[in-house]
A protein has these predicted regions:
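Bacterial N-terminal signal peptides that target proteins for export
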Residues: 1-10
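Bacterial N-terminal signal peptides
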Residues: 10-19
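Non-transmembrane domains of secretory- and envelope-associated proteins
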Residues: 24-27, 55, 85, 97, ...
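N-terminal mature ectodomain segment of secretory-pathway/periplasmic proteins
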Residues: 28-112, 157
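Short, hydrophobic/aromatic-rich segments at coil-to-beta transitions
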Residues: 44-49, 73-78, 166-174, 244-250
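Short beta-strand segments
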Residues: 62-66, 88-90, 183, 236, ...
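The alpha-helix within a helix-turn-helix
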Residues: 197
């Protein structure tokens, strides 16, 4: 079913931008957002390479790159790292292996481990957990803001034109959350930071920074005060491929500047992925 809205580093080259009146036309923005949601939700299986650059609590950017193949429902994902820990592999299938991740660290003693998906070793200095890989979080976020703000959401979105990025024509959208700020939140008994971030669709890495010493999966006490942000970011800049409406280049800013950068390349949407490719004994894997 189509998602409907009311009323119906790589060289980036500017192609054109329409008049300011057209560029901020709500109909165009609604069409782009609806197509992004539809496209992400329509593709259950996908492959890609992703480069990441993420700012840590010491104000340093940690880089990484990996190849992934995944199925969204039920969640199945295989990852092979290029940077850091080149050759390390991850396999996760929702509901199997006691919901643990199978990890081949590709280092001594060269044995595969089953570990909790929230184990910090899996982050490798990054911001996000395995369950958040891919594009589903973007679709969820757009749906969340459309439900919360309805047409007012489009007042936060600025269409900045069509650009060539990595030899692909892309819409560029800038989303401004002008009221972005830190807020206090009082936990309900036994909920965790991870559950709160998933429910509110806010940035887990940022919330960890704001609550040093609190484990992401530890149950909180009733009315325990924690620090959150009211949005995922202050500003998000998205390059959306005109061919498939996937946000293949993402720049995420907090109040201090660039916080996250994600680059997706070699995106494959239509190759069926066999069940055997989510098995530890698959011929190309080294678990």
């Amino acid at each position: 079913m189509k998602f409907k809205i009311n009323n119906s580093i790589i060289l980036v080259t500017y192609i054109f931008v329409t008049s300011s009146l057209f560029s901020q036309n709500d109909s165009l923005k609604k069409e782009i957002i609806a197509n992004v949601i539809d496209s992400i939700d329509a593709h259950n299986q996908l492959e890609f390479e992703m480069f990441r650059s993420e700012r840590n609590e010491n104000n340093k950017f940690i880089e990484g790159k990996f190849y992934a193949k995944m199925e969204n429902k039920p969640l199945k994902i295989y990852i092979k790292n290029e940077k850091p820990r080149q050759g390390a592999e991850i396999l996760y299938i929702d509901g199997e292996n006691d919901n643990k991740i199978l990890l081949n660290p590709n280092t001594f003693p060269y044995i595969s481990l089953s570990i909790n998906s929230k184990n910090s070793i899996l982050l490798a200095g990054g911001h996000h957990y395995v369950e958040q890989a891919g594009f589903s979080q973007m679709s969820k976020t757009f749906k969340y803001y459309l439900e919360k703000y309805q047409d007012d959401f489009f007042e936060m979105i600025y269409f900045e034109g069509i650009f060539n990025w990595n030899n692909k024509k892309c819409y560029r959208l800038r989303i401004e959350y002008e009221d972005y700020k830190q807020i206090s939140y009082y936990a309900k008994n036994s909920e965790t930071l991870y559950q709160i971030c998933e429910r509110e669709l806010i940035n887990i890495a940022k919330i960890k920074e704001l609550n040093p010493g609190l484990e992401i999966s530890k149950k909180l006490q009733d009315k325990q005060k924690i620090n959150l942000t009211n949005h995922y970011s202050k500003t998000s800049v998205l390059y959306i491929d005109l061919e498939n409406y996937f946000p293949i280049y993402q720049l995420i800013y907090d109040k201090y500047g660039l916080y996250e950068k994600y680059i997706y390349t070699k995106l494959v949407l239509n190759r069926p992925i066999k069940n055997e490719e989510f098995n530890r004994d698959y011929k190309d894997y080294n678990f």
